[in-house]
């Protein structure tokens, strides 16, 4: 709340000697600009191996045994993976049984992205992963790149103009997944 931020600002602006603060922030929520302006920002990205290691420690299980290898990217965060598992557990979805295409189809057909912003963000990441995998295995790289570029523009416009994601995802499914 605003009172807590004001108290934190006062402490940060007038610290005792030899006292340093490390503030850890989740990007899903914004920090007030007045607090952010007094901070040095370090963006930390984990390697794939480190991400898996951290996730395994948090879960107490091996994440690689719970999710199909096609659903992993080098850009997953432990939070992404845990959110994906929580989502799957709530809906009793066995992520080990779904290929990337099958999982994309499931998310779109059941409109899970409408009820959960995290799932919408994961769906967008899975769409990018789909294009990357398709690009890596195809001989017609220009076609895949053009489709990818077209959908990036559509995603950007959907965000920019606050358009409906349903039509975007249905178009992706009909033109790209089934096309």
Residue ranges and their predicted role:
Residues 17-20, 26-179:
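Charged, glycine-rich active-site and insertion segments that engage polyanionic ligands
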Residues 1-9, 30-32:
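Conserved AAA+/SF3 P-loop NTPase catalytic/coupling segment centered on the Walker-B
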């Amino acid at each position: 709340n605003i009172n807590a931020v004001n108290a934190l600002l006062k402490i940060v602006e007038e610290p005792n000697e030899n006292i340093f603060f490390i503030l850890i922030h989740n990007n899903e929520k914004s920090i007030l600009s007045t607090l952010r302006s007094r901070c040095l920002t370090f963006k930390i990205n984990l390697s794939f191996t480190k991400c898996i290691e951290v996730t395994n420690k948090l879960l107490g299980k091996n994440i690689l045994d719970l999710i199909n290898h096609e659903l992993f990217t080098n850009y997953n965060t432990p939070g992404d993976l845990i959110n994906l598992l929580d989502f799957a557990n709530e809906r009793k979805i066995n992520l080990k049984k779904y290929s990337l295409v099958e999982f994309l189809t499931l998310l779109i057909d059941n409109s899970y992205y409408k009820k959960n912003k995290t799932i919408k963000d994961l769906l967008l990441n899975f769409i990018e992963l789909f294009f990357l995998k398709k690009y890596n295995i195809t001989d017609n790289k220009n076609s895949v790149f053009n489709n990818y570029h077209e959908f990036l523009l559509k995603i950007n416009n959907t965000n920019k103009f606050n358009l409906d994601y349903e039509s975007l995802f249905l178009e992706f499914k009909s033109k790209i997944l089934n096309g």
